[in-house]
A protein has these predicted regions:
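Non-catalytic propeptide/linker segments at domain boundaries
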Residues: 1-30, 35-39
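Solvent-exposed loop/turn segments at secondary-structure junctions
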Residues: 32-35, 83-87, 118-123, 149-152, ...
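A solvent-exposed, charged loop/short amphipathic helix patch at secondary-structure junctions
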Residues: 38-54
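A short, glycine/acidic-enriched catalytic loop
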Residues: 45-49, 121-156
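Catalytic-core regions of hydrolytic enzymes
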Residues: 52-131
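Soluble non-cytosolic domains of exported or imported proteins
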Residues: 53-61, 90-94, 155-163, 207-215
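Active-site-adjacent substrate-binding region
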Residues: 157-184
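Active-site-adjacent mobile loop/cap segments within catalytic or ligand-binding domains
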Residues: 180-233
């Protein structure tokens, strides 16, 4: 277990400072082919179970919504729509990590890197969905995942990343108390050692529909965007 005091992290606040007028946030997808339960008009040619290369229906579409929502808050956002996990799932983190490094080299003003995914919740062949209790429409939940140095590998930024995650979680919880799942800390780095301000964000699960994920990420962005805009200097 990793000892964490949420109250202390909230009191510290995020270490992240976003530069004005330059690219600030990168959204990308290590597993871009991750898709959702087909429903309504959101039917897609599957390349594997709940996966598709069609960016109209996979997590890249959800990334488009997040990028636009954050941009509406005045943030400078880049969205890498490249599919790094197809045709080979193996090595996708190596490929996406190399791409992140290229972005950091090209845009040194970047301060936040979001690797946007959808989760997979299964048990005994039963697929589960996440549900935010909202009055108007079905909506998935969102989870922030923070890698640590618990594996012994180099990762000097994980506590700063956690401070950012706690800051965002608090901002979203204030507006939508059921939207966020608990923050998850893991032993693995998931490329988050490459730069400060790195987070994995999981929107929904394979049991959710695309529209449920879109509603969730839009609500997340509408709260997280203004919170991030307050970090611009």
């Amino acid at each position: 277990d990793i000892p964490v005091s949420v109250a202390a992290l909230l009191q510290q606040g995020p270490a992240t400072v976003l530069p004005a007028g330059e690219p600030q946030i990168l959204i990308m997808h290590t597993h871009a082919s991750e898709a959702f339960t087909p429903a309504g008009r959101d039917l897609y040619p599957a390349s594997d179970t709940c996966r598709t290369e069609d960016t109209n229906y996979n997590i890249v579409h959800v990334g488009d919504v997040l990028a636009n929502t954050l941009a509406s808050a005045g943030l400078q956002v880049l969205h890498d729509r490249t599919i790094y996990d197809y045709p080979s799932y193996t090595g996708s983190y190596n490929r996406s990590g190399a791409a992140v490094q290229e972005y950091l080299n090209q845009y040194p003003s970047l301060r936040i890197v979001i690797d946007l995914h959808r989760d997979a919740l299964c048990s005994d062949s039963v697929v589960y969905k996440t549900v935010a209790e909202l009055p108007d429409a079905a909506c998935s939940q969102v989870m922030l995942l923070v890698g640590t140095n618990a594996s012994g590998l180099y990762h000097p930024y994980w506590e700063e990343n956690l401070r950012l995650a706690v800051y965002l979680q608090d901002a979203v919880n204030a507006a939508h108390p059921t939207l966020m799942r608990p923050i998850t800390l893991v032993n693995e780095r998931y490329n988050q050692h490459l730069t400060r301000g790195s987070l994995i964000i999981e929107v929904g699960s394979s049991g959710n529909t695309l529209q449920e994920a879109i509603r969730a990420v839009r609500l997340f962005g509408e709260s997280a965007g203004p919170a991030l805009a307050r970090l611009v200097q």
